[in-house]
Amino acid sequence: MRNGKLMGDGDHDKQMPPFPRDLVLEARTAMKSSITLFWSFRSPYSYIALPRVVEISRQFGIDVDMRIVHPAALRNPEYFRTMNPLARPYFMLDTARAAAFHGLAFRRPIPDPIEQDPVTLALADEHPRARRLGKLGIAATERGQGLQFCVEVSRLLWDGRVNGWDEGSHLAEASSRAGLNLAELDASIAADPDRHEFSLEQNDAALRSAGHWGVPTIVFQGEPFFGQDRIDVLRWRLTQRISDPD
C-alpha cells in the first residue's frame, strides 16, 4: 500500500474502496448494544425516568437490561434513621416538580408499597406489597417483558388514577397490557419464591458493584449514570458511541 492505495501485480494502482458506513456502524453497535437499568417500583424518580429510557431504547436501537432491586427501605433501612431532616420535605417537593416538568401525572401510591410511618419514617417489620412487586418484576424480566411491565405497573402506582392498586383487577390489567398473565406470574413465584428473592438480592449487589447505591442508575459500557437528571448526559454519551438512526 502506498499513499492510501493498493498496489496490484502489474495492474494499475487502485484506490482502496471505502469500508461501507453501515457496516462500520453495525460493528460499533454490536460491541455493546444495551444499557442496564437498576430500577425500583417504589422510587418516584424511577417512574419519572422510565419514559425517557424507553425513548432512548427506541432512538438508539438498544436493549434495556432491567435489573429490579428492592426499595431503599429494604436495601438500606438505616438511611431513614440517619437522613437529614430537610431531606424528606425537599424530596417530596422535587419529585412532584420533576414529574410536572416532564409532563407526567404524579401522586404517591395508595397504598404505599412500603409500610412506613409518614411522620417518623419508622419502618414496619414486613413489607409484603413491596416484596410482591419486586418478585413480579423479576418474573416479568425473565419472560422478556420487564421493561414494558415496569412501564405499566409504575403508571398504575404513580399516576394517581387508581386508589388500591393492589386490589381488584388493576395489577392483572397492567400485566395484560405488558403482554403477561398475572396468574401465571404469581404461580411461578409461588413455586419458587426464594429464587425470585435471590434474584432481587443479586441485583441489589450488582447495583453497588456498578458504582452506585441509588435508583434509577443506568450503566452503559461500565459507566454508571445515577438519577433521572442524568439521562441527557447518558444520551450525550450514547451519541458518542452509537449512531443515532434519527
Q: Can you name each region flagged by the protein language model?
A:
Residues 11-13, 22:
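Intrinsic-disorder-associated, low-complexity terminal segments enriched in Asp/Asn/His/Tyr and depleted
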Residues 4, 8-10:
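Residue-identity detector for glycine
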Residues 41, 47-157:
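Structural alpha/beta surface segment adjacent to cysteine/selenocysteine redox centers
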Residues 6, 23-25:
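Leucine-biased recognition of intrinsically disordered, low-complexity hydrophobic segments
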